[in-house]
Amino acid sequence: EKIMHDGGDPVAFDHDCREGICGSCSMFINGQPHGPDRGVTTCQLHMRKFKDGDTIYIEPFRSRAFPIIKDLVVDRTAFDRIQQAGGYISINTSGNTLDANTIPIEKESADKAFDAATCIGCGACVATCKNSSAMLFVSAKVSQFALLPQGKVEATDRVLNMVKQMDLEGFGNCTNTGACHVECPKGISLDYIAKLNTEYA
């Protein structure tokens, strides 16, 4: 209120969905990615999680690969470039939904692929990692395709290209501290990092 009263610009922050599905609301709240509640993003955090009169500290995510644009807004387009390096399949769907069920997929594989695909690319994994590693993000994006038969065609190129792009973007190396999994609002499992390493070998 004081900033606006003094004629300054309001504090800039990203937001979009208000449903915890886009990841654009990412920020530190009292030193924790997305705040003190587990399994939710900033936009889903309720003020009742804090006591009346509490001082709340908000900060942008910090990583060399996520430069600050203004105030709480960071540039997370490095994730987009990693996706562009291999986050696709080349099967021609041509809008023919009749073919959707022609490739049988085991339920366990489909469920794991779906779980990996729930990654919203918010960057909490990078922001909380002492190395600023994007390994959890990349492993989720690699695994969502690697677990399905449609993703097998580009499997080798996908993992090589996405890991290479991750390195080019300046993300750190994974040292298996597990902080990324703990702070991930979608609970992406460290098992996907193991899957990525298997695909990379």
What are these model-derived regions, one by one?
Residues E1-D9, E59-A201:
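Ferredoxin-type iron-sulfur electron-transfer modules in oxidoreductases and energy-metabolism complexes
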Residues C22, M27-N30, R48, A124, ...:
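Mature cores of small secreted peptide/protein domains
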